[in-house]
């Protein structure tokens, strides 16, 4: 079985690669100098004819204002490759900003028109390799004694990148069992509670100040219930320390 991971150095891709290799599953990656939408990229995908492609490439608001790759790439993969493709969905698909719209375009295409792509939809937290844009990596980049705000009214029920990778492997092994979109969800918690868990589990002493901002509920109604986020963060820490 030939598996390609796109975006293997990003937040999600680096965990999927690490987890699959930990499970003794050989994975392939695309050379960093071959960029999306180039002839070399398209030739690489088509010529290699992978059994599965896990698409972890995506543009996020912290890094760019051009989000076209979020829908152009997954649609192109579905229309032009014979591989089975796994695509990450997000709770931001409900947002009406350019990022949310770009994710929704991809989601609507896959759910309604896709021939060989399936979505694992959830919001994710995890550790990055080379940057600190995501919630967990940003938080852990602070020094002990630093003060940060913890939003008490911003609710979330996502999962760690490790949980995503674990389910991704199950999806590969049981492809026909799942619909075009599977939503993973955990217990709904506040961003403040998430930071408190990270602080404790990673043995940090960052001061988290409760902050009552406007209420935002990003909790998804899902298909598969996962462990609560405290357990997931503990499992993530154990895994990255192996």
Question: Where are the model-predicted features located?
Answer:
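NAD(P)-dependent short-chain dehydrogenase/reductase
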Residues: 104, 108-163, 169-170
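Short-chain dehydrogenase/reductase
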Residues: 6, 67-71, 95-107, 133, ...
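Mid/C-terminal beta-alpha module of Rossmann-like enzyme folds, strongest
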Residues: 165-217, 240
């Amino acid at each position: 079985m030939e598996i390609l991971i796109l975006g293997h150095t990003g937040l999600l891709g680096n965990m999927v690669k690490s987890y699959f290799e930990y499970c003794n599953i050989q994975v392939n990656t695309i050379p960093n100098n071959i960029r999306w939408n180039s002839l070399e990229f398209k030739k690489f995908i088509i010529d290699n004819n992978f059994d599965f492609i896990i698409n972890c490439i995506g543009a996020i608001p912290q890094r760019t204002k051009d989000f076209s790759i979020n829908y152009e790439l997954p649609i192109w993969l579905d229309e032009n490759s014979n591989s089975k493709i796994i695509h990450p969905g997000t709770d931001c698909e409900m947002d009406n900003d350019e990022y949310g719209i770009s994710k929704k375009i991809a989601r609507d295409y896959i759910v309604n028109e896709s021939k060989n792509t399936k979505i694992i939809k959830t919001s994710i937290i995890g550790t990055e390799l080379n940057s600190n844009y995501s919630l967990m990596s940003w938080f852990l980049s602070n020094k002990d004694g630093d003060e940060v705000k913890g939003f008490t009214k911003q609710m979330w029920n996502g999962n760690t990148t490790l949980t995503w990778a674990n389910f991704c492997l199950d999806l590969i092994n049981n492809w026909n069992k799942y619909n075009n979109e599977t939503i993973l969800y955990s217990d709904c918690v506040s961003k403040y509670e998430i930071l408190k868990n990270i602080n404790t589990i990673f043995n940090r002493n960052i001061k988290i100040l409760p902050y009552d901002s406007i209420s935002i509920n990003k909790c998804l109604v899902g298909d598969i219930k996962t462990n609560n986020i405290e357990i997931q963060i503990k499992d993530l820490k154990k895994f990255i320390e192996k």
